[in-house]
Amino acid sequence: MALARRNVQPENRDSTRINAQIRITPVRVVSEEGEQLGIIPTEQALERARDAGLDLVEVAPGERPPVCRIMDYGKFKYDKNKKKNSGSSHTKTKEIRLRPKTGDEDIRTKVRQAEKFLEHKDKVQVSVLFRGREMAHIEEGRKVMEQVIEILSEVGKVETKPQQHGRRMICMIAPK
């Protein structure tokens, strides 16, 4: 036995209700331009949206009465996804590890790599690792850290100042 298809809009994946999915009445309506149209029955709000060739989208379901906006739902969904994806854009954290006795040329090599990371909009965690008796000479590690920060100041800015965490001194540098 075949079931008759109803003329119902497909269920959207997110919890945003649109058009006929909004069952509560009355609703507070905001026009496409952003002006308040007041609290009106849902049927009347749907009619206004249809007349404008747009959708009635429930934007604040937790309010009493719920707030609905007359807008193009496809565009709204696209902008929402775009905003969500741009927020978690690309930023990763890369690490360069140094020691208090690291030579100048080795430091420059590590700094060049850190500059590449910063140019690619990644954050850089600079770590100076201390072993054994090096813990008695933390100031040498701080000198190395300050040298790296000074060189990287052109392409990045210090996000967290150098801090001692056990046997490590850590500093975060973000791209400018």
Swiss-Prot record:
Localisation per UniProt entry: Cytoplasm
A GO-annotated cellular component: cytosol
Keyword terms, alphabetized: Cytoplasm, Initiation factor, Protein biosynthesis
Main location: cytoplasm
UniProt record, GO biological process: ribosome disassembly
UniProt cross-references to InterPro entries, sorted A to Z: T_IF-3_C_sf, T_IF-3_N_sf, Translation_initiation_fac3_CS, Translation_initiation_fac_3, Translation_initiation_fac_3_C, Translation_initiation_fac_3_N
Gene Ontology terms for molecular function: ribosome binding; translation initiation factor activity
Keyword Protein biosynthesis: yes
PANTHER family listed in its UniProt record: TRANSLATION INITIATION FACTOR IF-3, TRANSLATION INITIATION FACTOR IF-3, MITOCHONDRIAL
Protein role: IF-3 binds to the 30S ribosomal subunit and shifts the equilibrium between 70S ribosomes and their 50S and 30S subunits in favor of the free subunits, thus enhancing the availability of 30S subunits on which protein synthesis initiation begins.
Self-association and partners: Monomer.
Family: Belongs to the IF-3 family.
Listed name of the protein: Translation initiation factor IF-3
UniProt source species: Rhodopirellula baltica (strain DSM 10527 / NCIMB 13988 / SH1)
Gene it is expressed from: infC
